[in-house]
């Protein structure tokens, strides 16, 4: 005889929705799919109405007397509820400050990696603290560090705007970027493709009849 499976008490119990045959109340107040009140009817009649409409009977208020059910497309209802929950979770996202560190002599590959990190943070709705770290005598190259940070802000201008300009902080130079609320719209001048100037050549004037006669006499 095979051993009986052990019940894992740590595993969460999935609660099934109260729809259709899982509704056990004998009398129900039923609302039709279009919002029409069907009144208080017995469970079997409510199930028949939902079946005729090829929809589901869903318990929406169990504490009411009698309990309230609505006829609806439960699959569509569930999808919309999950969508609303995701949107609410997204709106409740707590803004964090993520940090991107680098040296002022960073190579192109590492710089691209830092840009990628910053883009991910900004798209998640977080602010980004860009930090240039100095070691030893490197502190004298603050101008190069500021140039690097402003270059970074320029490369990220479609996703972010400067919240705090580059400044010294101890032995570091920092800059804060915040996600851009509205998309960056470039001006027509920035999007304009430069065209080559067309050189205009003026044709020489045509000789008059008198000039041609004089030329023949001279010959």
Swiss-Prot record:
Entry's Gene Ontology molecular function annotations: ribosome binding; translation initiation factor activity
Protein location: Cytoplasm
Name of the protein described by the UniProt record: Translation initiation factor IF-3
InterPro entries: T_IF-3_C_sf, T_IF-3_N_sf, Translation_initiation_fac3_CS, Translation_initiation_fac_3, Translation_initiation_fac_3_C, Translation_initiation_fac_3_N
Swiss-Prot/TrEMBL keywords: Cytoplasm, Initiation factor, Protein biosynthesis
Taxonomy of the source species: Bacteria, Bacillati, Cyanobacteriota, Cyanophyceae, Synechococcales
Matching SUPFAM superfamilies: Translation initiation factor IF3, C-terminal domain, Translation initiation factor IF3, N-terminal domain
UniProt cross-references to Pfam families, sorted A to Z: IF3_C, IF3_N
Described purpose of this protein according to its UniProt entry: IF-3 binds to the 30S ribosomal subunit and shifts the equilibrium between 70S ribosomes and their 50S and 30S subunits in favor of the free subunits, thus enhancing the availability of 30S subunits on which protein synthesis initiation begins.
Organism, scientific name: Prochlorococcus marinus (strain MIT 9303)
TM regions (residue ranges): none
Superkingdom of the source species: Bacteria
Biological processes, Gene Ontology terms: ribosome disassembly
Entry's family note: Belongs to the IF-3 family.
Gene that encodes it: infC
Quaternary structure and interacting proteins, as annotated: Monomer.
Keyword Cytoplasm attributed: yes
Endpoints of the signal sequence: none
GO cellular component, one term: cytosol
């Amino acid at each position: 005889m095979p051993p009986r499976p052990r019940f894992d008490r740590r595993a969460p119990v999935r609660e099934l929705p109260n729809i259709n045959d899982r509704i056990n109340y004998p009398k129900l107040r039923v609302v039709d799919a279009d919002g029409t009140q069907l009144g208080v009817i017995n469970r079997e009649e409510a199930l028949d109405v939902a079946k005729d409409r090829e929809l589901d009977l869903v318990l929406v208020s169990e504490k009411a007397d009698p309990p309230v059910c609505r006829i609806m497309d439960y699959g569509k209802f569930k999808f919309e509820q999950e969508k609303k929950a995701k949107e609410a979770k997204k709106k409740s996202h707590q803004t964090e400050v993520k940090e991107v560190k680098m040296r002022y002599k960073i190579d192109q590959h590492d710089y691209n990696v830092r840009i990628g990190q910053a883009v991910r943070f900004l798209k998640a709705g977080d602010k980004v603290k860009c930090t240039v770290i100095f070691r030893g005598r490197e502190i004298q190259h603050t101008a190069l560090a500021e140039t690097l940070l402003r270059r970074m802000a320029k490369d990220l201008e479609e996703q972010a705007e400067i919240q705090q300009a580059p400044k010294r902080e101890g032995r570091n130079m920092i800059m804060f970027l915040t996600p851009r609320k509205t998309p960056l719209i470039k001006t027509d001048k920035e999007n304009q493709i430069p065209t080559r100037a067309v050189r205009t050549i003026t044709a020489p004037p045509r000789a008059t009849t008198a000039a041609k006669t004089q030329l023949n006499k001279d010959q």
